[in-house]
A protein has these predicted regions:
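N-terminal secretory targeting modules
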Residues: 1-67, 74, 78, 82-83, ...
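Extracellular glycan-modifying ectodomains
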Residues: 59-61, 108, 125, 138-150, ...
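Conserved beta-strand elements of the Class I
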Residues: 67-69, 90
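Oxyanion-hole/transition-state-stabilizing segment in secreted/luminal serine hydrolases
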Residues: 74-90, 99-137, 157, 161-165
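N-terminal cationic-hydrophobic initiation segments that often serve targeting/anchoring roles
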Residues: 81, 110, 148, 185-186, ...
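Charged helix-capping and loop-helix junction motifs
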Residues: 133-143, 173-178
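A short helix->loop->beta-strand "cap" motif at the edges of active sites that frequently abuts
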Residues: 151-155
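Catalytic His-Asp segment of secreted/periplasmic serine-dependent ester chemistry enzymes
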Residues: 163-243
Length: 243
């Protein structure tokens, strides 16, 4: 609360004025830090995005391909071209990406490729840092709206968050995020949900240890091949004939 300084003597006025200026400085500093945080968040993956843009200038990606976008589960999928040899795939995964980052960079990562289908894998990092299932869904809706403004009929698939044993303590929130997203997708045209959860569990409902690398968070090749098996029926007709 700011005191009324008009009825005070000179020393009191000086103290009152100092208190006011100090409070004002704190407010300005807090706002400045908030602005800096916003800028840092926006630029956190700038180098990653610029690297993709430079690679695309040097070797333009195929148009009308299936585009993968999202976090490290796609970024680390280095064998995707071998695992899906009958499809043209463009991979735009970035390590540690969240759904909000995908919204922020959609016009640079996604739209220039003019894909025929988009498959997302995001949400796990969101949950890991404490975002709610509702926030993940809200950001997913924002991504869909941003893309559909330019590509109105494009199919967009949300690859459900996986039950990695290294983050099994987050399983209830991950499952809830999958549930609310899947329920929303069921009400919308040209949105698909890739449900990986149950296939990655043992018969007694625990995460399968054979599908992960040493960190128990990211899939190994067997984990990616399982993903291919589940995804393939959603991909449509192959665009390449295998010899």
């Amino acid at each position: 609360m700011i005191r009324d300084c008009t009825t005070l003597d000179s020393p009191s006025i000086q103290r009152c004025l100092f208190s006011f200026l100090f409070s004002l400085t704190l407010v300005i500093d807090a706002r400045a830090q908030s602005d800096v945080s916003t800028v840092v968040a926006g630029n956190r993956f700038e180098k990653n995005v610029q690297a993709y843009e430079a690679a695309d200038r040097a070797n333009p990606p195929p148009q009308k391909a299936i585009l993968l976008a999202g976090d490290s589960q796609f970024f680390r999928w280095k064998t995707v071209a071998e695992d899906l040899p009958d499809y043209s795939i463009v991979n735009r995964g970035i390590d540690s990406f969240q759904t909000s980052d995908l919204v922020h960079f959609a016009d640079r990562l996604v739209l220039p490729c003019h894909p025929r289908m988009i498959i997302l894998h995001v949400g796990g990092n969101d949950v890991h840092i404490g975002k709610s299932p509702e926030q993940v869904l809200s950001d997913f809706k924002s991504f869909v709206a941003k893309v559909r403004a330019h590509l109105p009929a494009i199919p967009i698939a949300f690859s459900g968050i996986t039950p990695g044993p290294g983050r099994w303590d987050e399983a209830p929130k991950r499952k809830e995020t999958n549930r609310v997203t899947k329920e929303y997708i069921a009400t919308q045209p040209n949105l698909l949900f890739v449900d990986l959860w149950d296939a990655m569990l043992t018969a007694d409902g625990q995460p399968r240890e054979d599908l992960w690398v040493a960190d128990r968070v990211h899939p190994n090749h067997a984990g990616y091949l399982l993903r291919v098996k589940i995804m393939r029926p959603l991909l449509g007709e192959p665009d390449r004939k295998l010899k």
